[in-house]
Amino acid sequence: MNYNVKLIYSATSASLGNKGSDQSLSPYAFTKSKNLKLLIHLRKWFGFNYEAIYFYNVYGPRQIQAGNMATVIGIFEKQYLDKKALTVVNPGFQTRKFTHVKDIVNGCYRVWKKNLNRHYSIYENESYSILDIAKMFNSKIRFLNRRKGERYKSSTVKYVEDIKIWPLKCKYKIKDYIQNYINNN
């Protein structure tokens, strides 16, 4: 493989939890983890250059608000606009880390410029429970039954296999984003 090609792979934090056992929680986590394993092997076998960036609950303008790929923030925004109760999967204490889409774009650009063939993670330092996020919207809350495959804790790790994951700093905060959303809607 001598094509001077570089890939920036959008990895997922969904497959990192519970010492790797979360890789089988969903088809999404499963395929993302297998793709990453393939990239790791392509580097070992052929010297293939890539950067992997682990994204954490991306939010921002024009995010998906309905359907299987909807983001939790997108769902809450739609429910807020429709003046419906925000739906939270029981018990609501599931924690997540969040990343604004502008931090994703800036992070991808910085990684591309560095060209170091590393793994990176990008997320706001603070974790929030889904219930705490819902409360930030100052709306009624309705609890849904627990779901199979639900992760209960945000998973941040420092290594995948023997590869160090380098943290990238975020500029944007989910609290500020939600407050701004409420103020403008």
Task: Indicate residue ranges for each PLM-predicted region.
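Alpha-helical substrate-binding/gating segment
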Residues: V58, G74-T87, T95-S121
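Active-site helix of classical SDR
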Residues: P27-K34
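Glycine-rich Rossmann NAD(P)(H)-binding loop
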Residues: V58-R62, V88-F98, Y120-Y128, K135, ...
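Conserved beta-loop-beta element that borders a ligand/cofactor-binding pocket
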Residues: A11-T12, L38-R62, T87, I141
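Conserved C-terminal active-site "lid" loop/helix of NAD(P)H-dependent oxidoreductases
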Residues: V101, S129-D132, R147-N180
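Mid/C-terminal beta-alpha module of Rossmann-like enzyme folds, strongest
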Residues: D82, V105-G149
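Conserved Rossmann-fold NAD(P)-dependent oxidoreductase catalytic core, especially the SDR/UDP-sugar
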Residues: M1-P27, E51
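Active-site beta-alpha turn of Rossmann-fold NAD(P)-dependent dehydrogenases/reductases
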Residues: I8-S13, Y54-Y56, G92, Y123
